[in-house]
Amino acid sequence: MHNEKAPQSPTLAQLQQKVDEWIHTYGVRYFSELTNMACLTEEVGELARVMARKYGDQSFKAGETHDPSEEMADVLWVLICLANQTGVDLTQAMQRSFEKKTKRDATRHINNPKLKE
């Protein structure tokens, strides 16, 4: 029997560090924040296209990817770039977001008849 542990998924902080290292090794430098915001919008649009075709009423064109994970990773990549550029610690930001949503929405969705099956 092996005592090997499965590799752990990287944390948000580790992903932020890996993206920063990649940018400075291969990308020379970050694009401007405004350019990266435009890139993020573009990547979200590409994800929307895949979702519309896979889960909506549209059909795929020849040669289009059917896998939303590629587009989701692209969205996350550019979002991490923006976080790095603007000094946002995504781990702390997510913790604050969970706290805010939990306080604000503690009973909101439980009492929503639209979400009952």
What are these regions (language model features)?
Residues M1-M72, L76-E117:
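Flexible "arm" and connector segments at domain edges
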